[in-house]
UniProtKB/Swiss-Prot annotation:
UniProt keyword terms in alphabetical order: Methyltransferase, S-adenosyl-L-methionine, Transferase, tRNA processing
Compositionally skewed regions (Pro residues) per UniProt: 1-12
Binding positions for S-adenosyl-L-methionine per the UniProt entry: E84, D109, N136, D159
Gene (UniProt): trmB
Protein's UniProt name: tRNA (guanine-N(7)-)-methyltransferase
Length: 253
């Protein structure tokens, strides 16, 4: 086994002193999303993952939603573009893509092991409506997703970064929501789930005052599981440990 050479999306490229930095780059430097990237993958599996990522990659530069759908392999019949941030082992992403072949799906993560498992699921299920990116989520939003393109965003069980000094690493932050909001169409769904009570409260504290999102839970703040909800191995472990799964459902104004 060899140590997996993981990408380092949080490292901004050097810029010559005196050179202007565009707005997207400046925003990416101010706020970085984090994921735990440690792990080992043997060379054979790594080669397969890299080949799979190359085949299913989402290149940057789509000018608008139509161009994005073209890059995703969709057509005029494509109904929705759904993004999952942090898909883990790909249970939800693969299942939803199989259920809805008319839709286009994008998965973002930084775990190579998870990509390997998801790629196997896609191959076994003959699922072709998924594109994948192994990169920092904020960077993907700024560089690869045109404005008003996403019909749904799923963030299930993001790393809670439980130590207070690490709270700044949590993905749900005001600046992240500021970057996400313009990428979503009006009426698009943002669904989140966590098994850590403190993080659930943190999510609510950041989403409730945000002017771009409206809580759909009644009476709230937490929602019932969405109709499409798929129980994952990660969820089962949390429940077995005695933790409560809390769901949030917001719509983009």
């Amino acid at each position: 086994m060899s140590q997996t050479p993981m990408p380092q999306p949080d490292q901004a490229p050097p810029v010559d002193v005196g050179q202007p930095v565009d707005e997207a780059e400046a925003k990416r430097r101010r706020f970085k999303t984090h994921g735990r990237k440690k792990g080992k993958v043997n060379d054979t599996r790594l080669a397969r993952i890299e080949a799979g990522l190359l085949a299913l990659s989402l290149p940057p530069g789509s000018a608008d939603r139509g161009a994005l759908i073209d890059q995703l392999g969709g057509n005029g019949q494509s109904q929705r573009v759904i993004l999952e941030i942090g898909f883990g082992n790909g249970e939800t992403l693969a299942a939803l893509a199989a259920r809805h072949p008319e839709d286009c799906f994008i998965g973002i993560d930084v775990f190579l092991e998870g990509f390997g498992t998801l790629l196997n699921r896609l191959t076994r299920g003959d699922i072709s409506n998924v594109r994948l990116v192994c990169q920092n989520a904020l960077q993907v939003l700024l560089e690869r997703i045109p404005d008003a393109s996403l019909d749904g965003v799923i963030i299930n069980f993001p790393d809670p970064w439980r130590k207070k000094r690490h709270f700044k690493r949590r993905i749900v932050q005001t600046e992240f929501l500021d970057a996400l909001a313009p990428k979503m169409r009006s009426g698009a769904d943002l669904t989140l789930a966590t098994d850590w009570a403190n993080y659930a409260e943190w999510m609510v504290a950041h989403l409730e005052p945000h002017t771009a999102f409206v809580n759909q839970a009644e009476p709230g703040p937490f929602a019932a599981p969405p109709p499409w909800w798929i129980e994952t191995n990660f969820e089962r472990k949390g429940v077995a440990a005695g933790r409560i799964i809390r769901h949030l459902h917001y719509k983009k104004r």
